[in-house]
Amino acid sequence: MRPSGRKIDQMRKVSFERNFSKHAEGSCLVKFGDTHVLCTASLEEKTPPWLRNSGKGWVTAEYGMLPRATGERMKREAAAGKQGGRTQEIQRLIGRSLRAVVDLQALGERQITLDCDVIQADGGTRTASITGGWIALYDCLKWMESRNMIKVDRVLKDHVAAISCGVFASQPVIDLDYLEDSSAETDANFVMTGAGGIVEIQGTAEGTPFSEEEFTSLMGLAKNGIGELVALQKQAIAG
């Protein structure tokens, strides 16, 4: 039995609140249970130096956690003067995941930055950031389309979403909360497109290596979960 009472293949309640920020071209407050992340997409009419005069645009991401997003207050990374390794790893993952479904040539020489700020953390902040970040990116592109800058269906090739899976109490489970994640025997993150393409898989065993059979079970849970998340994304943007 999972501490939350959920079934092994049951995700937490997921919700998207679009246009949460009045200033950003695109924004979304995403909730995976008690994990809440504000994702904003900001458009700039410039590209990184290595892309100048290439005709291509860029999509990148930054990630951070509010000091009291966790049980005890964390010091702001800005106060330390540098980002931690975990932060850099996560924001690169978010950027890679979103670029996987964007035609950078069709975007033109512009940059969209996704800022993913964790308001409350209870496990799965990176997967929530990717899934909610796609909504914010979509709304930013719709904003651009309304100003005759691009066509959304030419720039955005597919949905992308992410979910965590792991082995907890010797059982493969989906969408681990913090209590499960902190004591899981295996922890994995899956990023996939709406068409089922694999963007990234991160998997780590804690102490005991996991078997190919266990990995196959986790992969099956992830595919079903991401299918549900993509359906929720479609429902959110249709509203």
From Swiss-Prot:
Gene3D superfamilies: GHMP Kinase, N-terminal domain (3.30.230.70)
NCBIfam families: RNasePH
Family per similarity comment: Belongs to the RNase PH family.
Keyword S-adenosyl-L-methionine among record annotations: no
An example Gene Ontology molecular-function term: tRNA binding
Transmembrane intervals: none
Assembly with partners or alone: Homohexameric ring arranged as a trimer of dimers.
Name of protein: Ribonuclease PH
Organism in which the protein naturally occurs: Rhizobium leguminosarum bv. trifolii (strain WSM2304)
Disulfide bonds: none
InterPro entries: ExoRNase_PH_dom1, ExoRNase_PH_dom2, ExoRNase_PH_dom2_sf, PNPase/RNase_PH_dom_sf, Ribosomal_Su5_D2-typ_SF, RNase_PH, RNase_PH_bac-type, RNase_PH_CS
Keywords carried by this UniProt record: Nucleotidyltransferase, RNA-binding, rRNA processing, Transferase, tRNA processing, tRNA-binding
Enzyme Commission number(s): 2.7.7.56
HAMAP family: RNase_PH (MF_00564)
Domain of life, per lineage: Bacteria
Function field: Phosphorolytic 3'-5' exoribonuclease that plays an important role in tRNA 3'-end maturation. Removes nucleotide residues following the 3'-CCA terminus of tRNAs; can also add nucleotides to the ends of RNA molecules by using nucleoside diphosphates as substrates, but this may not be physiologically important. Probably plays a role in initiation of 16S rRNA degradation (leading to ribosome degradation) during starvation.
